[in-house]
Amino acid sequence: MDPQGYAEIIDVRTLDEWNSGHLEGAIRMGIADADFTAQLATLDMSADYYIYCRSGNRAGQAINIMKDMGFTGELVNGGSVANASSQLGLPIVGD
């Protein structure tokens, strides 16, 4: 998959998980954050997004929330960080 095909690559994990390593170029929008839907509302609802977490569960939940909010672009569940890294060919980096 070409990472350039997505408006954003979104990591929906906790801040601690993000700090332990995330995809280069990803943005963090933690699904457990109180302002998660407010963060999503800042995005282009017609664009394509690649979403990942630790196992794919929270990414799936985030995709459902995005669909309920009216997102119409392609929403891809990348599963885990390692799987997403492999699929997109992006390194895992730390802050």
Residue spans of the language-model regions?
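Short, surface-exposed ligand- or partner-binding patches at beta-edge/loop junctions that are enriched
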Residues: 52
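Rhodanese-like catalytic fold shared by cysteine-dependent sulfurtransferases
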Residues: 3-7, 15-48, 57-95
